[in-house]
Amino acid sequence: MPMRSKTPTPLRFSNGKHQRDDSEYSWTDVGTGEKARNVSVLGAIRRAAKKVFVIIFLGQRKLKPTECRSDPGESSTHDRESTLSGWTGYSSPSSFGRSTERKVSGQYRFSGSRFQSPGKDSSSSKSWHQGPVIFSFGELQRATANFSSVHQIGEGGFGTVFKGKLDDGTIVAIKRARKNNYGKSWLLEFKNEIYTLSKIEHMNLVKLYGFLEHGDEKVIVVEYVANGNLREHLDGLRGNRLEMAERLEIAIDVAHALTYLHTYTDSPIIHRDIKASNILITNKLRAKVADFGFARLVSEDLGATHISTQVKGSAGYVDPDYLRTFQLTDKSDVYSFGVLLVEILTGRRPIELKRPRKDRLTVKWALRRLKDDEAVLIMDPFLKRNRAAIEVAEKMLRLASECVTPTRATRPAMKGIAEKLWAIRREMKETMICSSASNSSCSSTTHSFIGRDSDRYALPRIEDNENSIE
């Protein structure tokens, strides 16, 4: 019987469904090992030829006069190309795997690639571009009323974040860097975030719309997520506290995102800064992972298993094995995710210095309770203590304990973690249905959980009746 073989690939998502780009990747029925190798070699040759063509074609093509901007004070397409190609480590526009942006009659385009302008008719669940737009400063000034404080929605290590409205009506988040931040390390993080975001596309990852690097202005334009971050929800700053079913759904969304980064991209991507404040929440209480300034791509060299690098991350979330060896792997993200699971269950921050000394490290405190069969005592005081919620708390805490083991080799992969979370979800649903059958008035948690079932984003190869990701 013929076997199925495939080339691992990033998946493109539209309306919650994953699609494959048939122009570059395809499923192939293979009858023998020799045929599989031939198909693999042929695919590699085609991709290499395509890359060479793009580099030569885009590198030599000249702009027509009508394709240049006429707006005063705005950079030309040639300037934009120079900015992009002038970056250290990114020698040409094709370094992004994308093409250089041009603007003609108000419509954004890319040479040699498909592009859909993010107009008012475009669905928020669809990716509206195939690469980053290089904005002009004038465009971003108009979008934010000259960076008015009225439009300011946040501030962080990068700088100030504004809510903006592009010329075509698209609402975006505009991250403007602090000018006194500029240094070699910071500039690397700025460029790294753009480079990483330009290579990924997933419903549970914040989308990159574009950027600006002109003079002393450094700006990143990303998808606007309207409902704050997970930490704000756990602190009760965003209205009603999250119920257990909603917390589980958010954990699954983050697991989806990390599984994609580790498994389905061309080269595995390690986020390196998974924490509650980097998990943005939509109005439908779905999660999107943000902030890729620290992200790293694992080498494409055969056999590469880690990156030797300076330690980066947030206190309380950093993998102790990474701290000890300076070797970064995807299991470092797994450790951070385990800390995040504990944070979701308890509502506490990873480190709380105002608590008694033995309870200051939230993970250690929670795992002591688990060892004493007292998992219910770690639950956020605002969570309802029904049967389903208590069972989920214990199962998620056991899963978190696997993620935060000191030795990375014993930690599960994100793919397996996602499978276990789906199993917990199915069991919770069954418990709720059984409870509601004997009690005509279901809890609000039951309603919120079942009601979200039809609205969830799908992870590739995971369905309610499946036990694994293939």
UniProtKB/Swiss-Prot annotation:
Keywords: ATP-binding, Cytoplasm, Kinase, Nucleotide-binding, Phosphoprotein, Serine/threonine-protein kinase, Transferase
Residues at which ATP binds: 153-161, 175
Active site: 273
PROSITE patterns membership: PROTEIN_KINASE_ATP, PROTEIN_KINASE_DOM, PROTEIN_KINASE_ST
Subcellular location, record wording: Cytoplasm
Segments of this protein annotated with the region Disordered: 1-29, 65-128
The keyword Kinase is assigned to this record: yes
UniProt modification remark: Autophosphorylated.
GO biological process, one term: response to abscisic acid
Residues annotated with Phosphothreonine modification: 309
Molecular function GO terms recorded: ATP binding; calcium/calmodulin-dependent protein kinase activity; calmodulin binding; protein serine kinase activity; protein serine/threonine kinase activity
Positions carrying Phosphotyrosine: 322
Induction notes from the record: By cold, salt, abscisic acid (ABA) and hydrogen peroxide.
Residues modified as Phosphoserine: 277, 308
Superkingdom field: Eukaryota
UniProt cross-references to InterPro entries, sorted A to Z: Kinase-like_dom_sf, Prot_kinase_dom, Protein_kinase_ATP_BS, Ser/Thr_kinase_AS
CDD domains (alphabetical): STKc_IRAK
Domain Protein kinase: 147-423
Compositionally biased intervals (Basic and acidic residues): 65-82
Pfam families assigned to the protein according to its UniProt record, in alphabetical order: Pkinase
Presence of keyword Transferase: yes
Region (CaM-binding): 162-185
Subunit structure comment from the entry: Interacts with calmodulin (CaM) in a Ca(2+)-dependent manner.
Entry's family note: Belongs to the protein kinase superfamily. Ser/Thr protein kinase family.
Protein name as annotated: Calmodulin-binding receptor-like cytoplasmic kinase 1
The gene coding this protein: CRCK1
